[in-house]
């Protein structure tokens, strides 16, 4: 089915460096039906998809409340619970992604409602330039095995979704198939084909989950760019060390008319350690 990908592999050739297959380049170890993913180093993760917060169009008072609530949400994660925020912009092949709900009524105007709904969907699609913007939070814990990790992750997941609910933000946990579908879409840019996968395919075919999501090839030989199949991409790294940041920074990046993925890897630092780090940085800063 996709065994040919193992032959093409990830072109990562160099001196004394073996070529990896496309599957071997994908760094997770196993994906479970309930959405628990095992990573190297005994780390287990889960992902929750959430919708946008209407921050930019809110009043100043509401923005303050939203910011305060979001800060409390982030403070839920202590130093033992690393997490990642992912913002993915993709070209839309269908306008059904945009949800506009005008309920039907028992009168003669449902045709007008349908027409108005279609018009709103078209306007939303045009305003986004055909870009679908999705948001995810992934959190992980170290554990000896899946039996230990699963109940702990489920508790964190329930807390995260409860915090989103208090913010008025709809959220939904991602099961294993949904996470695989997301990875598949990331590794097959602009692919219009639906993701075809069922857990019963694993024992029937003898393939692993990576065989269903891996691209034909991954090429990382260039220092600044990489290639997935026939598409080229680039990665930029930004380390944020500023004491203050504009609340528009992320929004302005995500509003670019481009397919891209922005990830924020966040590790809460113990308060005492943070104070020591800030004090040391202050002492070592050069004077002018």
What are these regions (language model features)?
Residues 1-286:
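Extended, folded cores of ATP/NTP-driven motor/assembly subunits in large transport
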């Amino acid at each position: 089915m996709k065994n040919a990908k193992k032959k093409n592999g990830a072109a990562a050739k160099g001196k004394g460096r073996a070529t990896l297959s496309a599957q071997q380049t994908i760094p997770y170890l196993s994906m479970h039906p309930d959405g628990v993913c095992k990573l190297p180093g005994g780390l287990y993760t889960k992902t929750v998809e959430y919708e946008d917060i209407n921050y930019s169009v809110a009043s100043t008072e509401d923005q303050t409340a939203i910011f305060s609530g979001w800060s409390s949400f982030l403070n839920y994660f202590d130093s033992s619970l690393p997490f990642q925020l992912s913002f993915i912009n993709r070209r839309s092949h269908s306008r059904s992604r945009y949800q506009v709900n005008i309920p039907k009524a028992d009168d003669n105007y449902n045709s007008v409602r349908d027409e108005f709904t279609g018009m709103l969907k078209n306007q939303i699609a045009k305003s986004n330039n055909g870009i679908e913007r999705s948001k995810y939070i992934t959190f992980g814990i170290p554990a000896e095995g899946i039996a230990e990790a699963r109940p702990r992750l489920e508790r964190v997941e329930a807390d995260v979704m409860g915090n989103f609910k208090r913010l008025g933000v709809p959220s939904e946990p991602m099961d294993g198939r949904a996470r695989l579908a997301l990875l598949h879409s990331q590794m097959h840019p602009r692919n219009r084909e639906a993701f075809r996968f069922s857990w019963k395919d694993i024992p029937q075919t003898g393939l692993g989950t990576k065989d269903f999501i891996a691209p034909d090839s991954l090429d990382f030989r260039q220092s600044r760019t990489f290639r997935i199949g026939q598409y080229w991409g680039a990665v930029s790294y930004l380390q944020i060390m500023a004491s203050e940041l504009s609340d528009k920074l992320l929004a302005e990046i995500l509003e670019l008319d481009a397919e891209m993925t922005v990830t924020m890897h966040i590790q809460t630092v113990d308060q005492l350690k943070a104070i020591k780090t800030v004090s040391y940085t202050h002492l070592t800063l050069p004077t002018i």
